[in-house]
Amino acid sequence: LKKKIAVIDRQKVNLSTVAFVQIKTSQHNMAWAKKFVEGVKEMDEVIEFYRLSGASDYLLKVLIPNIEKFDEFYKKLTNKIDLSDVTTSFAMEEIKQTSALPLNYI
């Protein structure tokens, strides 16, 4: 086990909006990546953060109370570091969410 967690109903803690933020960059050097990663890790709204292959370079899963708070988050993100493109999709409905791992591959 890495750690034990409590699963909290995000609606009850005013985090009803889920945003998936795709980021493209023209910068692919270590100095830029380090600054970007450190900046994103400081942002409490980001609950998942991935470096990707394909059309986008990074994907963030962000929890916020509403669109106005997302706009504040977006401005904070884009002021931290130079990004080529930021595209956001908002979840309309959560169909499945789990932290349980698929252990049938062991």
What are these regions (language model features)?
Residues 1-106:
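A compositional/biophysical signature of low hydrophobicity enriched in polar/charged and small residues
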